[in-house]
């Protein structure tokens, strides 16, 4: 009997890459591969890459240098190792990757993962194995589905891609060029994926897409469904305790999405809503197609639907031409909104984007100083948000055992880690926890009950269950 071949995948970047990595594992599992945590022991190493920032793509080439040594060592011991570069760097740079790193055997863009077995076979025959086209077929219809055992091993929370690509063309962003135009999966296929996950014990579904609330998939009635309508359908699936979605664009928040937050108890009151800047001048230069006031109105609409809703966001400091006045407008917006969490980055020019050719670059010193000021404000808001949980009872979905013996960790509705002393038989349940204290970014508390309440009926309005 031929021993299974070993596969190691290292992913960089977004949630979509995490999901894509899992689907590559499933697809290659059908070809006889099993995962290994040791790249040096692998027959195939895949780097699933991110192209959003320069540092992320340069990390890939540093890693390829290390893998070249591992590949040479494997060859000396009589073992063939293949190296594949996947993801957005693969899509953007294509053949340039093999020019810079000849040790690479396969280059495959994010829309072609279902062709990996054929590409690996081509490489084994010494043929060129590069695919960075946007094929007409839907890759999701060809990717292997995970086994029940694989789903269980990945935990009680899972990602499901519902949408890929972006048509917004923000001037700083490579996504429209690396992921292509917006494409939405049919509702029926999404529902099938979610049902397979919940049948295997998954309790939290996160619907993901580069611009997820631009979702416009074909419904079972033959009509185009929006994300809001899709959320109602997902909430009907038995076993779904929690629903999330990411990442959103303010311009695609419609009444149906707001209504889903109002009506569906399964939809978590936590929205990742990137804004990037609080300066209208910079927002225009970014081609965001909304103002700071437009963004505030979207936030107000969400808060009108649920008063317990909280937000996270993304911010870029040092965009070309950003002045101190522009930056202060961003700080003012953060003050006005009040975030539970946020992610901040220094502007990084990406080749091929309009912003890369803009003049008036902000100095590295100014970027560092602004990033520190912005992050300090975000950290203080996050600390205040977490501190406000002390003394309250919050629902926690328990996910796994913690590092401390006898302790479990789960997530609140706002994705805060929550730790309690409890037995592992409550993993997968949503239980009330009284929060007693904080430890850095984690909440510490005690179970109030050890029996989970029934998952609410689908689309049950919040008002009908009290509170």
UniProtKB/Swiss-Prot annotation:
Binding positions for [4Fe-4S] cluster 2 per the UniProt entry: 166, 170, 173
Domain TRAM: 387-449
SMART domains from the UniProt entry: Elp3 (SM00729)
Segments forming domain Radical SAM core: 152-384
PROSITE patterns for the chain: MTTASE_N, MTTASE_RADICAL, RADICAL_SAM, TRAM
Pfam families for the chain: Radical_SAM, TRAM, UPF0004
InterPro entries: Elp3/MiaA/NifB-like_rSAM (IPR006638), Methylthiotransferase (IPR005839), Methylthiotransferase_CS (IPR020612), Methylthiotransferase_N (IPR013848), Methylthiotransferase_N_sf (IPR038135), MiaB_methiolase (IPR006463), rSAM (IPR007197), rSAM_horseshoe (IPR023404)
Annotated compartments: Cytoplasm
E.C. designation(s): 2.8.4.3
Residue span, MTTase N-terminal domain: 5-125
Reactions catalysed according to its record: N(6)-dimethylallyladenosine(37) in tRNA + (sulfur carrier)-SH + AH2 + 2 S-adenosyl-L-methionine = 2-methylsulfanyl-N(6)-dimethylallyladenosine(37) in tRNA + (sulfur carrier)-H + 5'-deoxyadenosine + L-methionine + A + S-adenosyl-L-homocysteine + 2 H(+)
Main location: cytoplasm
Keyword flag Zinc: no
Residues the entry annotates as binding [4Fe-4S] cluster 1: 14, 50, 88
Family statement: Belongs to the methylthiotransferase family. MiaB subfamily.
Subunit-structure text: Monomer.
Name assigned to this protein: tRNA-2-methylthio-N(6)-dimethylallyladenosine synthase
């Amino acid at each position: 009997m031929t021993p299974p071949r070993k596969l190691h995948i290292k992913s960089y970047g977004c949630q979509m890459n995490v999901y894509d990595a899992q689907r590559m594992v499933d697809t290659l599992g059908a070809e006889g591969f099993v995962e290994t945590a040791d790249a040096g022991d692998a027959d195939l190493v895949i780097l699933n890459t991110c192209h959003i920032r320069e540092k992320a793509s340069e990390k890939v080439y540093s890693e390829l240098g290390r893998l070249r040594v591992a590949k040479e060592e494997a060859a000396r011991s009589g073992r063939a190792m293949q190296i594949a570069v996947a993801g957005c760097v693969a899509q953007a740079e294509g053949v340039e990757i093999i020019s810079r790193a000849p040790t690479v055997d396969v280059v495959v863009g994010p829309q072609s993962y279902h062709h990996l077995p054929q590409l690996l076979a081509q490489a084994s025959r010494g043929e060129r194995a590069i695919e960075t086209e946007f094929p007409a077929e839907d890759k999701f219809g060809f990717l292997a589905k995970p086994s029940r055992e694989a789903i269980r091993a990945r935990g009680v929370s899972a990602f499901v891609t519902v949408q890929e690509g972006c048509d917004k063309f923000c001037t700083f962003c490579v996504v429209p060029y690396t992921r292509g135009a917006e494409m939405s999966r049919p509702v029926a296929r999404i529902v099938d994926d979610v049902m397979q996950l919940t049948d295997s014990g998954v309790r939290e579904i996160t619907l993901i897409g580069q611009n997820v609330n631009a979702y416009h998939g074909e419904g079972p009635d033959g009509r185009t469904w929006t994300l809001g309508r899709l959320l109602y359908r997902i909430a009907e699936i038995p076993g779904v305790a929690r629903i999330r979605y990411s990442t959103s664009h303010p311009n695609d928040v419609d009444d149906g999405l707001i209504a889903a937050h109002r009506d569906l108890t399964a939809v978590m009151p936590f929205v990742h809503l990137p804004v990037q800047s609080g300066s209208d001048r910079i927002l225009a230069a970014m081609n965001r197609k909304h103002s700071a006031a437009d963004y505030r109105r979207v936030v107000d609409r969400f808060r009108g639907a649920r008063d317990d809703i909280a937000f996270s966001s993304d911010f870029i400091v040092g965009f070309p031409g950003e002045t101190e006045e522009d930056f202060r407008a961003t700080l003012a917006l953060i003050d006005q909104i009040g975030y539970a969490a946020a992610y901040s980055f220094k502007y990084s020019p990406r080749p091929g984007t309009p912003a890369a050719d803009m003049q008036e670059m902000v100095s590295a010193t100014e970027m560092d100083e602004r990033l520190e000021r912005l992050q300090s404000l975000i950290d203080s808001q996050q600390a205040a948000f977490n501190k406000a949980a002390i003394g309250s009872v919050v629902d926690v979905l328990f996910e796994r055992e913690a590092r401390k013996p006898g302790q479990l960790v789960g997530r609140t509705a706002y994705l805060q880690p929550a730790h309690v002393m409890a037995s592992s038989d409550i993993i997968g349940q949503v239980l009330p926890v009284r929060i007693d204290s904080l430890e850095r970014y984690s909440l510490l508390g005690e179970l109030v009950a050890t029996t989970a309440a029934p998952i609410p009926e689908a689309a049950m309005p919040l008002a009908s269950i009290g509170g």
